[in-house]
């Protein structure tokens, strides 16, 4: 197993080779040249990256295709978020998407007393018991990945007799100038849907229906 630094450098080089996409034709020899290491070490890194879910690998007649997974991209976006925090760079983002209905899970989770107390203490709101779900446009997925890399406002998880409720992170946001918060699990879940909480029933407040297109400004 290679070091985390070698993982990061390898994923970064693969992304550089891929440019705008997340896939690149890249031999282990070429990656070795890019990293300044032996071909054997580069081959081992590629195998480790694939085994640990950071990339997928396909061999074709044209050569080897390395595709960076969401887990691999998270390595880069987390590094970006850490550098932004260290350098005090603000990275507010705008995400566009479509209003969609969930399975009612948002209401169940938001209604937990242990969460509500923290929402009031840390976010300054007692939320409407439900979430507004937005299916993120393909073009906004890089912005969603960027948000996932940031720490946000920590909401502590807890246990009950029946189950465990995980920690959550929240980000201040606005939708049509109405303050709200984007919430997501601290344990990364790869989904193209974001959940929004507010002290208002946003569907009624903004007259939103499934299929409506919206933009959400998120403050990291």
Swiss-Prot record:
Binding site for Mg(2+): 131, 133
Positions that bind CDP: 102-107, 200-203
Named cofactor requirement(s): Mg(2+)
Top EC class for this record: transferase
Region: H-T-H motif-like, residue numbers: 1-92
Cross-referenced InterPro entries: HTH_CRP, RibK_CTP-dep, Riboflavin_kinase_CTP-dep, Riboflavin_kinase_dom_sf, WH-like_DNA-bd_sf, WH_DNA-bd_sf
Region annotation Riboflavin kinase: where it falls in the sequence: 93-220
Positions with a binding annotation for FMN: 188, 195
Record field: catalytic activity: riboflavin + CTP = CDP + FMN + H(+)
Pathway field: Cofactor biosynthesis; FMN biosynthesis; FMN from riboflavin (CTP route): step 1/1
GO molecular function terms attached to this record: DNA binding; metal ion binding; nucleotide binding; riboflavin kinase activity
Keywords annotated in UniProt: Flavoprotein, FMN, Kinase, Magnesium, Metal-binding, Nucleotide-binding, Transferase
Pfam families: CTP-dep_RFKase, HTH_Crp_2
Biological processes, Gene Ontology terms: FMN biosynthetic process; regulation of DNA-templated transcription; riboflavin biosynthetic process
Keyword Kinase on entry: yes
Keyword Metal-binding: yes
Note describing how the cofactor binds: Binds 1 Mg(2+) ion per subunit.
EC number: 2.7.1.161
NCBIfam families named among the record's database cross-references: PRK14165.1 (NF010762)
Function: Catalyzes the CTP-dependent phosphorylation of riboflavin (vitamin B2) to form flavin mononucleotide (FMN).
Family: Belongs to the archaeal riboflavin kinase family.
The protein's name in its UniProt record: Riboflavin kinase
Organism phylogeny: Archaea, Methanobacteriati, Thermoplasmatota, Thermoplasmata, Thermoplasmatales
